[in-house]
Amino acid sequence: MIARLLSAPMLIAAFAILVGTCVDALVKGVAPGAGLHHLLAWRFLFGALLSLAVFLALRKPVPGWEAVRFHTLRGLLQLFCAFTFFYALTQLPLAVATTLGFTAALLVAPVARLLLGEKISPIAAGATLLGFAGVAFALSGQSGAGDGAGNQTLGLISLFSSTIGYAFVLVLLRMRALIEDATTIALFTNIVPALAMLPVTFGLFGAPDGRDLPVFALLGLLGYGVWYLATLAYGRAPAQRLAPLEYTSLVWSALLGLVFFDEMPGWQLWVGAVVIIAACLIVAFEGRFRTRREARLPASDLPE
C-alpha cells in the first residue's frame, strides 16, 4: 500500500499542499499568543531533531563543505521567508496571504536570470505583469485586516518580502535537488534555522508557555513532512505536472479561514486569484510549449 502511494507523485504533492495549508492556519491561530519568535525557534528545533533522526537512520552520507555552505545560505534565507510569511499570516486573512503568495512563482524567472543567467522570454515577462495586475485587483476588495489598516500594510510588506525570498529559495533548491536527496535537503532546511534561533530557544528573549510546546512540536513535524513530501514528489514527476496542484491551497485556505477565523473572501480576491493562477500556469507551461514547437511536435500529448 505504501509503495503504491509513493509511486503516485501527484497524490503526494496534493497531500503536502493540504498539510502545508493546515500549518499556515495553525500558525495564524497560535502565533499571536505564543510569540512568533518562540514559534519559529521551537518549530525549527523540533523539525531539526526529526530530520536529523531520519538522516541518521537512513545512513545518508555527510555532504561536503561546499554543500554545507550552500545549504547554510539557503537555510538562513528559508528562516527569513518563514518569519515574514508567518508574520503576514497574523495580519492578513488566510486566503489573501495564500493568493498573494502565489506570486513567488512569477518571480522565479527574474531570480533565475539573476542567479543562473537564464533568459526571460517575452511571454514569461508578460505573464509576470499579468500576475501582478491580478494582485492589484485582488487587493482592491480588501478594506482592512488584523487590528487596522496599518497592520494590513505591514502584512503586505512582509508577505511580498517573503515571496521574493521564496523565489530565491526555489531557484537555489533547483540547483541542488538534482544531486541531493530529499532527506539531506529537508535536514538543512530545518537545522540551519534551528541553529540560528538558538538564542531564542535558550531563553535569552524570554521563555515560552509550556502549554505551547506540543503545538510547536506538531508544527515541526508537519513542517518537516511538507518539505519531505514535496521534494519526494518533485523527484518522481516533472515539475510542470505538479505545479498546478499548488493552487488547490487557495480552496483549503478559504475553507479553513471561514471555519476557524470567520474570514469570508470577497469576489475581487477570487477574480484576482484566477488571473494570478493563469499567469503562473503560462509561466510554468510556456517553456514546454516552446520546446515542442521547436521540435515540431504537437502542443499536447493528448490524442486528437
Feature map (PLM): residue ranges:
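Hydrophobic transmembrane alpha-helices of multi-pass small-molecule transport proteins
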Residues: I123-Q142, Q268-G287
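Cytoplasmic-side transmembrane-helix entry/capping segments in multi-pass membrane proteins
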Residues: P9-A14, E66-L76, I120-A133, G155-L156, ...
